[in-house]
């Protein structure tokens, strides 16, 4: 994908807005066209206004703009978090099986999420911390810090400190 315009376009279409309707009192219809094609970038203020019009926080999508399907990845990530919070290991395992069939989760940094969540299930669901430590340490060694969310790194350290 690679730019926020694609996400704006998909949200606009999902809401049934024309470019003209989306742009009203924000910018020109042509400017929306250029944003959606990746030829222009919206300012932070414009992104806020577009978010309000679309009823979605577009800022949340920046971490997913390089995904083939940012909506699917964002949804799975939210579901992973809910399962971890609720210690729902069966649902988490099911989600991981589904995620392994999504192309984005086969490449970094998203593949780390699948690996980490599998370890999380072993550590907290099966009480197998000891045999999971080497794999957790390996993940930390492999992480490219500029591509992985700091919260992810904190989660790995939290499991290691259990």
What residue spans do the PLM features occupy?
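Alpha-helical residues within helix-turn-helix
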Residues: 10, 20-21, 49
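Helix-turn-helix repeat elements of alpha-solenoid scaffolds
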Residues: 83-98, 124-141
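DNA major-groove recognition helix of helix-turn-helix/homeodomain DNA-binding modules
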Residues: 45-60
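Short alpha-helical DNA-recognition segment
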Residues: 15-34
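"A position-specific structural signal for the A-helix of alpha-solenoid helical repeats
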Residues: 74, 78, 110-121, 152, ...
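A short, Lys/Arg-rich alpha-helix, primarily the initiator
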Residues: 1-14
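Flexible helix-coil transition and linker loops at the boundaries of alpha-helical arrays
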Residues: 64-65, 100-111, 140-153
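Short, charged recognition helix plus adjacent turn
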Residues: 63-88
